[in-house]
């Protein structure tokens, strides 16, 4: 195909065998007649005539810019002009976005086409008109229509379920199924019988789009939030694209968008495929995009299994984070990989309940990554999070039992409570929603519409700083670290010295313990020796007592023997007592002799040392003389008394023989004795 300003002719199969060539879009200055190979021109090159610049069209001619009407073709549908005039030709889009079948006007009039017709879908208008939707029945043979290009303000074009042609995106962010508008118009897809959906092109600025699921979910559609949170309910589950001020659309099988400050979206609705279509095993979840100030989104759940004949595998697209900490949640049927881009102030990354791994990127002020709940039969997921500037807590992974999906809630860094359905957020507060997922799905990566923005830089403190400031700060930090290192080194040195001293003390204690052990062993040996000696002495005493008992038995004898031996024992005791007294008397005599000898020696010493004319000596000598005379008198008196007694005894015997003489003799004796004394 050569260069042209019109849209080329495309064709797509919707699951049936019959196909038809889709009409091309109108050129700038009109359309040309059909040709197999278009050359370089400014008009349309398909068989069907397209709208001209000013929207007027005749049979087989192009439509002018302002919608002039002419004759119509029999099978065509009238196209509207700029201000709503209806034409009868099957014209292509004009400069301001008239639909090809039918053409839309400037302010978004909508025309429909009958189900089962082979007319293609049109191109959106300037301000987001809604084009016709083609509904394919169970037995329809209508071919797939070409996807219309996105207008300036994001009109929605009709899409067919079985279309394989990617749709072009709008100016500020395309979506997975159809082009997106700037102010959030809505697209309504057509229900096809079977087929697969392709991935659309990435939008111009790349951070707002998301991809459609790779499977064949029933009637997937895209819900686009308006500028200030317009609420519109899409036909089926799809992917929502954020607007300029962050309306949030949370879709779970057909939920509507959330306005700017977190209004509750519409309830969910579920659509069923046609009777002749194959029902996929898993329905693709919706990829939600959070708002600017943290509108909360609902969680989307995917069934674990379906009872249809064909099975489709879905992949979960990435969710784009808001600026001030909204919460977006996605769910994948089975194992899927979801990459979340963090917001500016404490957003919570999207949580993916899947059997695969979930990677979350941390935010600037330390958000807590959402938890990943694994529900697969025999696999344990791994959650990886990139640390933030202020120390976010990494994600925690919980692996439940086989076939049992669990729900884990993870609040944001502002300590907002977590719920399992949806919760509105206020300011920088975010609420993490939990998602559950089914089993038996393969792991896929994010689509082309996902954001490719990497994590924020970890060195914001070096921004807008001069080299001197950086070097000064580094020098200050180095000095501080050196001081801390020296302090730590001093502590370590003190600890090392204590360890050395304690080691020496322990060595001394060990030596003392060893010596005490040796001493205790020696004492035990000596005690054993003493114990043996005591045992030996006890043995000898027992033997001596036994021998004494035998000796006493021999000496005492019987009772008669005891009586005979009594006097002998008494004599023996008396003899022993006499010997003892004799020994004591001998000792006493010896002691007295010794005392006398000592006294005499002392007297001699005293007598030798005294002078002859000493009065004391003379007195002693006189006294000694008196003592000697007294002793002599005593001795002679005793002798004389003995003689007198003897004489009296003799005289008594004599007086018995001679009477009368006794008295005279006695008197004479007494007189003589008295005279002698006188």
From Swiss-Prot:
List where Polar residues composition bias occurs.
1-23, 38-52, 59-68, 100-109, 174-183, 233-245
According to its UniProt record, which protein family does this protein belong to?
Belongs to the nucleoporin NSP1/NUP62 family.
GO BP term (any one): protein import into nucleus
Q: Which intervals carry biased composition (Low complexity)?
A: 69-96, 110-170, 184-201, 209-226, 246-295, 324-446
Question: What is the designated name of this protein?
Answer: Nucleoporin NSP1
Single GO MF descriptor: structural constituent of nuclear pore
Q: Does the keyword Nucleus apply?
A: yes
Which residue ranges are recorded for the region named Disordered?
1-295, 324-461
Q: How does it assemble?
A: Component of the nuclear pore complex (NPC). NPC constitutes the exclusive means of nucleocytoplasmic transport. NPCs allow the passive diffusion of ions and small molecules and the active, nuclear transport receptor-mediated bidirectional transport of macromolecules such as proteins, RNAs, ribonucleoparticles (RNPs), and ribosomal subunits across the nuclear envelope. Due to its 8-fold rotational symmetry, all subunits are present with 8 copies or multiples thereof.
What does the UniProt record say this protein does? Functions as a component of the nuclear pore complex (NPC). NPC components, collectively referred to as nucleoporins (NUPs), can play the role of both NPC structural components and of docking or interaction partners for transiently associated nuclear transport factors. Active directional transport is assured by both, a Phe-Gly (FG) repeat affinity gradient for these transport factors across the NPC and a transport cofactor concentration gradient across the nuclear envelope (GSP1 and GSP2 GTPases associated predominantly with GTP in the nucleus, with GDP in the cytoplasm).
- Domain comment? Contains FG repeats. FG repeats are interaction sites for karyopherins (importins, exportins) and form probably an affinity gradient, guiding the transport proteins unidirectionally with their cargo through the NPC. FG repeat regions are highly flexible and lack ordered secondary structure. The overall conservation of FG repeats regarding exact sequence, spacing, and repeat unit length is limited. FG repeat types and their physico-chemical environment change across the NPC from the nucleoplasmic to the cytoplasmic side.
Subcellular location field: Nucleus, Nuclear pore complex; Nucleus membrane
């Amino acid at each position: 195909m050569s260069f042209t300003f019109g849209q080329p002719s495309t064709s797509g199969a919707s699951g049936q065998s019959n196909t038809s060539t889709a009409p091309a879009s109108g050129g700038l200055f009109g359309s040309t007649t059909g040709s197999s190979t278009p050359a370089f021109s400014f008009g349309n090159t398909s068989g069907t005539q397209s709208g001209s610049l000013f929207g007027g069209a005749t049979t087989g001619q192009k439509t002018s810019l302002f919608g002039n009407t002419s004759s119509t073709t029999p099978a065509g549908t009238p196209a509207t002009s700029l201000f709503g005039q209806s034409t009868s030709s099957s014209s292509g889009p004009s400069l301001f976005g008239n639909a090809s079948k039918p053409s839309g006007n400037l302010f978004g009039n909508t025309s429909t086409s009958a189900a089962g017709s082979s007319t293609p879908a049109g191109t959106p208008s300037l301000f987001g008109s809604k084009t016709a939707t083609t509904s394919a029945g169970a037995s329809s043979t209508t071919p797939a229509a070409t996807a219309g290009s996105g207008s300036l303000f994001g009109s929605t074009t009709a899409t067919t379920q079985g279309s394989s042609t990617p749709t072009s995106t709008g100016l500020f962010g395309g979506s997975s199924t159809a082009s997106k508008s700037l102010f959030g118009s809505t697209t309504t897809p057509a229900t096809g019988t079977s087929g697969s959906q392709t991935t659309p092109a990435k939008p111009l600025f790349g951070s707002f789009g998301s991809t459609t699921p790779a499977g064949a979910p029933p009637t997937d559609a895209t819900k686009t939030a308006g500028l200030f949170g317009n609420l519109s309910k899409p036909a089926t589950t799809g992917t929502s694209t954020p607007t300029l001020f962050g309306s949030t659309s949370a879709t779970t099988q057909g939920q509507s968008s959330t306005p700017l400050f977190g209004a509750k979206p519409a309830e969910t609705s579920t659509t069923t495929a046609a009777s002749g279509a194959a029902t996929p095993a898993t329905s693709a979840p919706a990829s939600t995009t959070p708002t600017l100030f943290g509108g909360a989104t609902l969680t989307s759940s995917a069934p674990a299994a379906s009872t249809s004949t064909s099975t489709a595998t879905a992949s979960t697209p990435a969710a784009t984070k808001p600026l001030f900490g909204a919460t977006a949640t996605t769910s994948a049927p089975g194992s899927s990989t979801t990459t979340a881009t963090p917001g500016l102030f404490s957003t919570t990354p999207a949580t993916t309940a899947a059997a695969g791994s979930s990677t979350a990127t941390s935010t600037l002020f330390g958000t807590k990554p959402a938890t990943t709940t694994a529900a697969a039969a025999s696999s344990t997921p791994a959650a990886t999070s990139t640390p933030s500037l202020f120390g976010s807590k990494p994600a925690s992974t919980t692996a439940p039992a086989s076939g049992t999906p669990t729900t884990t809630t993870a609040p944001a860094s502002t300590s907002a409570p977590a719920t399992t359905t949806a919760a509105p957020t206020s300011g920088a507060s975010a609420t993490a929603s939990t998602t559950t997922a089914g089993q038996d799905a393969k792991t896929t990566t994010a689509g082309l519409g996902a954001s490719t923005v990497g994590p924020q830089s970890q060195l914001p403190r070096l921004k807008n700083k001069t080299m001197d400031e950086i070097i000064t700060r580094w020098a200050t930090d180095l000095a501080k670290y050196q001081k801390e290192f020296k302090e730590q080194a001093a502590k370590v040195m003190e600890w090392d010295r204590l360890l050395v001293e304690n080691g020496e003390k322990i060595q001394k204690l060990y030596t003392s313990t060893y010596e005490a052990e040796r001493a205790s062993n020696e004492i035990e040996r000596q005690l054993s020796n003493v114990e043996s000696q005591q045992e030996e002495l006890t043995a000898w005493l027992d033997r001596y007592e036994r021998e004494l008992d035998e000796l006493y038995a021999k000496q005492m004898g019987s009772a008669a023997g005891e009586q005979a031996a009594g006097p002998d024992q008494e004599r023996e005791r008396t003899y022993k007592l006499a010997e003892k007294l004799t020994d004591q008397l001998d000792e006493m005599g010896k002691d007295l002799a010794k005392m006398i000898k000592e006294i005499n020696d002392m007297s001699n010493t005293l007598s030798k040392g005294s002078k002859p004319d000493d009065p004391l000596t003379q007195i002693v000598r006189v006294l000694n003389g008196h003592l000697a005379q007294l002793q002599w008198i005593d001795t002679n008196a005793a002798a004389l008394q003995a003689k007198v007694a003897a004489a009296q005894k003799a005289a008594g015997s004599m007086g018995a023989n001679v009477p009368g003489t006794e008295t005279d003799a006695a008197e004479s004796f007494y007189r003589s004795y008295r005279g002698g004394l006188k």
